[in-house]
Amino acid sequence: MFKSMIVAAAVLLSTHAIAQQFSITGTVKNGKSNQVLAGASVQLENQNRFAVTDEFGRFRIEKLPVGDYSMLIRFIGFQEKTENVSLTQNVNVTVTLDESVQLTDEVVVYATRANEKTPTTFTNVSGQALSKQNFGQDMPLLLNWTPSLVTTSDAGAGVGYTGLRIRGSDASRINVTINGIPYNDSESQGTYWVDIPDVASSTQSVQVQRGVGTSTNGGSAFGGSVNLQTTSLRTDPYAEGMIAAGSFNTQRYTMKAGTGLINDRWAFDAKVSKITSDGYVDRASSDLGSYYLSGGYYGKKTVIKAITFGGHEKTYQSWNGNDSETIKTNRTFNSAGALYDEAGNVKGYYDNEIDNYNQDHYQLHVTQQLSDHWNANVSLHYTYGRGYYEQYKQGKAFSDLGLNDLVLKDTIISSGDFIVRKWLDNKFYGGTFSFNYDKEKTNLTIGGAFNQYGHAKHYGEIIWAQYAASSQIRQHYYDGLSQKNDFNIYAKWNYEISPALNAFIDLQYRYVGYTTAGTDDDLVPYDISDKFNFFNPKAGLSYSLSAKDILYASYAIANREPNRTDYVNGDVKPKHEKLGNLEAGWRRNSDRYAFEANYYLMNYTDQLVLTGKLDNVGNPIRANVGKSYRTGVELSGTIRLTERWSWNANATWSRNKNKDYVADFGNVDEKKNTSIVLSPDWIAGSQLSCNAFRNFQVTLLSKYVGKQYLDNTQTESLTLDSYFINDLRFNYTLSPRGMKELGLSLLVNNLFDVKYSSNGATYGDGVAYYFPQAGTNFMAMMTLKF
């Protein structure tokens, strides 16, 4: 009897043990720097169970029975590692990965990025973080929760024409590179994300630098820089599909696939995407398509990668904004394309008031390991863009289109209705290079680029006229040509003075030559020949108080040339801008939290600030203002509150002032110490996440932007009200048989239905115009990964 009881107890205990389930949690780190690795994959071998590390480098795999497991841990740019775990209770492990001895795609962006010892201010955003939020909105909206960043959307729903400002600086002052290749338009200096829709789904990582930052290719950063790296090598074959749909008939379809590494040498990746939306604003529709294709050879000491990507966008124009009275009575009214009767009432709309543009990019990157301490990267690139704005012009004077009056017997007709297209056909090509040296205490990069924006044709076509005899079909009413040469060379040296103290020196020379000929759309001759020689030095120190704490300080000088709009719309020839930028801060990283506090001072001479006016195609007009400054404090941090709760937050307090601004609206009026246009004193962002249960995450995303002035006179009636917006996001992932992952996501934008505008303008008439944003709206997405 006693023996029977023992046997029965043993059976019960063993059954209980088998029934018990445990979890494996852990952190993945860089074995060299001890920094956490966000976005690393952790897979249980021979099982369809996996996890991806979060922003703290953490992972969790739950509901596992007792047993022995082998975990395969991978992260791009690092050697994969197998970790064995014997599971009889909940286990927590720390895994360190060694950097890959084989060259990786990261070398392409290494020269233009900052690292933890660089004494400048920056934020890294992983592709994993982008994908959680990527329901089809443009890149600016996905970066909305990085410090000191404000986003705009003409259509009001984040699809179509969008923009961003960093520390109050507009898009023309933010340097954007894709794989180290300049993306900003050479003439306008603007960044048109709409031309490469859904670029986020082909992005491996983004680094946002604030202030001047480190030397980069293209125009100097006068407010910040955004550095994108596209898809890196994935060693295993994959296929992915994303389907999203929601409010305003917004739809997104994306297909991605890759071969993985073939014969340990070759890899190919492809993506196609389609996004459509009716927009929140009336008729502000978007029809966007994009593609990405890459092929690479990965040798032990050589990487050769060819990339092509691009897009086609057709958007209905919505860049005029609405005055305050219209905002109150008809928020979604869109004056673009409106047709008026003699009494000034809207009688209809022109159905093809569109922007239609194609842009194709080609890049070839060659990376070579020269020795144990030297590697080199050479890149060639070519971009071809072409497209037009189409507009219906009511009562347009013939003389405005270079036409003679029409004489019919005793009647002279001097105006009429026309449909015109304003064309831009341009090419951008060149090469970049960098040589990188890394040994013990010394890190040295020598790099540069030569790029030409050439054969750029600006011209206007008349495609229809009310009076047929007044013009010919597709007759040109203006023609202009432009060319811009841009050369730069830089050297960056980071030296370890002691185990705790690092010195950083960054010296750059840049040459710009800009020439134009012909007329602009106002038929005024546009003949420019300008040359600039800039020297942009930077220097700083970083000091490691401990393995977790770094203090840094740097000072940088930058110079920047005017853009095309400055020349065209300026009453006097614009001057180039000069900037002195001081950055000082403290970074702390621990297993549980990361925190950064920094102070910045940006002193400008002849800053080209926004006047608050827009030109006839929605481009902001700027003017030199003598001396001005931006100064502030930025706080940012990420903390793991509990095993399930984490919080990522940032806040900026700043002052943005013109010391001596001269306003000229008929009467010259000198203004002292006025606020710089569209530069809020307060900006804050928050992402509060809860891993409610296995593979289910809920995130509350919050954004506060303070009051902004719409011109530089600091007139209280010309302001953009502060706003506080909350979004709610749900992400749930499953691992059904036969699939790597099935993801289900829901995004509730503007949870509390706040009526707000994210952007505004004034045309010098004392009237404020606003760009309203959507109230509560929804997007749902399904992601399939194989």
Model-derived segments and their meaning:
Residues 5-8, 19, 309-312, 348, ...:
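Conserved C-terminal beta-signal and adjacent last beta-strands/turns
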Residues 369, 375-381, 544, 550-558, ...:
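Membrane-embedded beta-barrel scaffold of Gram-negative outer-membrane proteins
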